[in-house]
């Protein structure tokens, strides 16, 4: 048997226009990417936020995919859920990670899921052979799932951190 882990979810997207006061400090947090864990479900990322006055715009984290254990029958493992966003003028969800699968023919074939993408880059690709998951390649994207053998423990790919872009208009 073997196991194909799902990919991690991508982070959400938010866009907001604020009227601001020059020389004023504003609060922000840039979210971290989730991390792959050897032999366990992936860790969630953290949210990116930007606060002006009483309004906090949040691009929420993508979740890690659950652990994929060895299977001897046709099996699918869920990918992580993409993050949502709140309080933006435009709010978008991160893409869900795709599931990993185990196909049973003469010998098991394992395929891991790709991570969820974002507007700012490419996710970690899925695998079609036993190996550790691929790391994400763009801001706010999820890592690819690991593909395991019958007794081999593997680690999912890491997600990428979020990004905050501030455009100033006069």
What are these regions (language model features)?
Residues 1-52, 143-166:
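Glycine-rich strand-loop-strand elements at beta-sheet edges
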Residues 53-134:
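Acidic, glycine-rich loop-and-strand cores that form catalytic or ligand-binding grooves
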């Amino acid at each position: 048997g073997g196991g194909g882990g799902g990919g991690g979810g991508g982070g959400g997207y938010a866009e907001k226009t604020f009227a601001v006061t020059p020389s004023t400090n504003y609060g922000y947090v840039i979210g971290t990417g989730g991390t792959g864990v050897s032999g366990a479900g992936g860790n969630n990322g953290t949210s990116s936020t930007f606060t002006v006055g009483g309004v906090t715009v949040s691009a929420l984290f993508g979740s890690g995919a659950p652990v994929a254990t060895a299977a001897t029958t046709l099996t699918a493992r869920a990918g992580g859920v993409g993050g949502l966003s709140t309080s933006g003028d435009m709010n978008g969800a991160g893409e869900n990670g795709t599931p990993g699968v185990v196909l049973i023919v003469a010998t098991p074939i394992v395929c891991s899921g790709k991570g969820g993408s974002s507007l700012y880059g490419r996710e970690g690709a899925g695998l079609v052979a036993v190996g550790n998951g691929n790391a994400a390649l763009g801001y706010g994207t999820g890592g690819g799932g690991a593909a395991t053998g019958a007794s081999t423990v593997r680690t999912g790919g890491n997600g990428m951190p979020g990004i905050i872009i501030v455009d100033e208009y006069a």
